Each structure stands twice: as C-alpha cells, then as structure tokens.
From Swiss-Prot:
Protein name: Alcohol acyl transferase 1 allele GSb
Keywords, alphabetical: Transferase
This protein's record includes keyword Lyase: no
Taxonomy, superkingdom: Eukaryota
PANTHER family: ACYL TRANSFERASE 4, OS05G0315700 PROTEIN
Gene name of this polypeptide: AAT1GSB
Residues at the active site: H164 (proton acceptor), N385 (proton acceptor)
Functional summary from the UniProt entry: Involved in the biosynthesis of volatile esters which confer ripe apple fruit flavor. Alcohol acyl transferase that can use a wide range of alcohols as substrate to produce esters.
Family: Belongs to the plant acyltransferase family.
Organism: Malus domestica
Any Pfam family matching the protein: Transferase
Tissue specificity remark: Expressed at very low levels in the skin of ripe fruit.
Additional notes on this entry: The fruit of cv. Royal Gala exhibits a high ester accumulation, whereas the cv. Granny Smith contains low ester levels; this influences strongly the ripe apple fruit aroma.
Any one Gene Ontology molecular-function term assigned to this protein's record: acyltransferase activity
One of the protein's GO biological processes: fruit ripening, climacteric
Length: 455
C-alpha cells in the first residue's frame, strides 16, 4: 500500500461548463422546502469507476463526461445559473447560463492502491474534490463543482459538490442519470426534468397542523462541550453493519416489534442510544434524531411529477429525554424512530413548508443532542453508468457535523451498511465502546470494520 502523504494529483485549468445550446434566461423561485436555512450548504459525493476497455475502449472519461455534462445542462439549465435572494431572503435562481465548475485531474495511483480510502469518510476528498477559493458559497456561486480524476489503472473518480437547496439525493440522481445517458449516446434524458417548485410552496394562508420537533427550540442542559469543539477536535469514523451486527441487534428487540421495523430503523435506534451515551448528555436534555423521509412515491401520498428534482423530503424527529433513552432497552429507541417516521405524509410536508414561512426559516438545532440521519443505501448512485459500468463505490463522501448518511458497502464477503459519524474525538472513543457494548458479539467484526480520519 502506497503512502498517501505523497499522493500527487495534478489539476488542469478550472473550467466553466455551460449548456451545449442556448437556454431560457429567466428567474425561477425555489420552493419553501428548498430554501430553508437548514439546506443552505453543499454536499460532497464521490463515484469511483474501474477501467473497462470492453465497454469503452480508448475513450477518455474526462472528454466524455465534460460533453455529456454540457448536453445535460440544456435540460437542467437552472443548475447552470446562480442563486440570489429576494425579499425576506427568499431564494431564486437566476438562469443566466454561466455554467458549473469543472476540473480535469490525474493521479499517480490505482483504484486498487486506494483501497478503502475511497469510502466515507474519504480522507483524500480534498485531493479528488479541490475546494477552489470562492466556490463553496451559496449566493452568487456556481451550483455544482465537478472534478474528474483519471487514475494510472485506467479507472477514474468523479467527485462533485452540489448546492443542497437545488436538489435532494433523488433529484441529484436524476441529473447524474441524464449525464450518464448522454455519455452513452442518448439524445435526451429518459426522464425529462420538471421544475414546478410551486408544488411545494406554502399554503395560503399558511398553517402549522403537525408537531415538528426538528424545528423546536429546546433548553440546552449540556455543558457546551459539543458546541465548543472546534473542527480540529472533530473526527469522523465509519461503522459497518453487516449480517452479524444486525442479527445481534435484532435479538434485543421483542418479536412483535422487530417484525415491523426496517434495517434503517434498527441502526438509527442503535446510533441514537450510543451517541447519547458517548456525548454524556445531561439526563434532562431533550434528544432528537431526525430521519430524512422521501416524500416521493405512493407511500406518503405526495403527488409530484416523475422528473421533479427539487427537495421533496421532511425530517420528522424521534424525541426523548436523554435519561430514558439511555436507561431503557434498545426497543425504546426503536419505537421512537418508527413513531417519528410514521408521521410523514403530505399533510406533514405541507405543514413543514408553512412553518418555514411563518417562522422565518428556522435552522435545525446545532446542539450535540440533535442528529439527522439519511438513508442513501437505495438512492441509486451505484447504478450511474457513464459507459464504464457501475461504480465500485458511489455516494456521499463523508458525514457533515450533525448529519450522517448511510451508504451501501460490500466488504468483499457480504453487502452491509456503512455509517459515517462525526463527533469530538473523546466522544468518538466512547461511541465506539458503547457500540461494541450494545453488539457484544462478535466484537472483532465491528472493530475490523472501523475507519477513522480527523477532519
């Protein structure tokens, strides 16, 4: 295994990729779900591909993807624009066709040498997705940054950073799929994009009809250690949940409960309890874990067009004081998670939009007693094929402070779920201990599948 302290990534000139054809010059409003304060950040995604000469012999992935991006932007032209604020900080996109940032790069390393360094939390992310000065803002900045890095083995890494106000994971997947289809020769996306953000505007008059713990102000009984932890003291580690880990967790749940819970529910309950113990949260402190729930599809009765690529989710929160969460069996936390997710329907989403307008777009809590979890295991990033087959890995590149993204991962023996976490260093050690305690056998399986990197 090579030393990554000497990894050489050479980048060429930064480019602006514009739509391949003239597009409408107009201003489009974002929805009231899109422009909430809690989504005004950028999300990094990494996608890693092997060389596949049988599928794309003598083709240059940089050239193919660059051209496909330009053609896809004809259909997704708002992504080539810039955000601006209107009255009351309402976000809108100026569809001016200025383009997205694109950089071509090469690295003197093979995909095999990189090994699990491509997995979240990716310690080499800054090499494969360079943070160009002035590129990471929200207002007036490019909405996408894409870096394609060619490797010596013939494979490549596509890393991108997207402004979350423009799309969620299913929306980003629609755009990536369109690029991939263009790269493979299609003349148009198989699913045409739909803007129609007015579908998720607040009602007239707006009215809050549901309880939204995720936006509530709560009394902070903590000692402030989480908030005072600077970035140099924060670490990220990924925890692997395979068949053995899940079997041990299920044994702790009553049969009538386990029959109606998902793998996501069980992992989230486990994280909620272990994290609360690790942070030594005051017993009286309210603890909230928000589950990102996609509004698309028939299950939640939210009628949106197939090509809608805006944010269409809510984050209902499991709510409890720290003391019962820590002292009760795991089934207690599991019931809270299931109850929170069950509140999600069209009325809940409409109530969120109304709350955001009535209360001036409140931010999600920034205390350590709050966590957001997002299940990306079925997001579909692993199906994006630019002509080199499916990626070895594709998904969010790391956790984001109070946000954890679950991703699918095969550890060479089985498919499991990788969960990156971000915590102060001292709390991370305790979190690992609590996790090993709650899944007492086999300890070695969990320990062998831990990855950590300081951020």
């Amino acid at each position: 295994m090579m030393s990554f302290s000497v990894l050489q990534v050479k980048r060429l000139q930064l480019e602006l990729i514009t739509p391949a054809k003239p597009t409408l010059q107009e201003t489009k409003f974002l929805s009231d779900i899109d422009d909430q304060e809690g989504l005004r950040f950028q999300v990094p995604v990494i996608m890693c591909y092997k060389d596949n000469p049988s599928l794309n012999k003598n083709c240059n992935p940089v050239k193919v993807i660059r051209e496909a991006l330009s053609r896809a932007l004809v259909y997704y032209y708002p992504l080539a624009g810039r955000l601006k604020e209107g009255p009351n900080r309402k976000l809108m996109v100026d569809c001016n066709g200025e383009g997205i940032l694109f950089v071509e790069a090469s690295a003197d390393v093979t995909l095999e040498q990189l090994g699990d360094k491509i997995l979240p939390p990716c310690p080499l992310l800054e090499e494969f997705l360079f943070n160009f000065p002035g590129s990471d803002g929200i207002i007036g900045c490019p909405l996408l940054l894409v870096q394609v890095t060619c490797l010596t083995c013939g494979g490549f890494i596509l890393a991108l950073r997207v402004n979350h106000t423009m799309c969620d994971a299913p929306g980003l997947l629609l755009f990536l799929t369109a690029i991939a289809e263009m790269a493979r020769g299609a003349h148009a996306p198989s699913i045409l994009p739909v803007w129609e953000r007015e579908l998720l505007f607040s009602r007239d008059p707006p009215r809050i009809t549901c309880v939204h713990h995720e936006y509530e102000d709560v009394i902070d009984h903590s000692d402030g250690s989480y908030a005072s932890s600077n970035q140099s003291n924060m670490v990220q580690r990924s925890f692997y949940f395979g068949a053995k880990e899940m079997r041990v967790l299920r044994k702790q749940i009553p049969p009538h409960v386990i029959s109606t819970c998902s793998t996501f529910d069980l992992i989230t309950a486990c994280l909620s309890k272990c994290r609360t113990l690790a942070l030594k949260i005051n017993p009286k402190q309210a603890v909230r874990v928000s589950c990102v729930v996609n509004a698309r599809g028939k299950h939640h009765n939210v009628r949106l067009p197939l090509g809608y690529y805006g944010n269409a989710f809510a984050c209902p929160a499991a709510f409890s004081k720290a003391e019962p969460l820590c002292k009760n069996p795991l089934g207690y936390a599991l019931e809270l998670v299931k109850k929170a997710k069950a509140t999600m329907n069209e009325e809940y989403l409409r109530s969120v939009a109304d709350l955001l307008v009535l209360r001036g777009r409140p931010q999600y809590s920034s205390t350590g007693s709050y966590l957001i979890v997002s299940d990306n295991t079925r997001a579909g990033f692993g199906d994006v094929n630019f002509g080199w087959g499916q990626p070895v890995f594709a998904g969010p590149a790391k956790a984001l402070d109070l946000i954890s993204f679950y991703v699918q991962h095969n550890n060479n023996t089985e498919d499991g779920i990788l969960v990156p976490m971000c915590l102060p260093s001292s709390a991370m050690e305790r979190f690992q201990q609590e996790l090993e305690s709650i899944t007492p056998e086999p300890k070695e399986d969990i320990c062998n599948n831990l990855r950590s990197t300081s951020q």
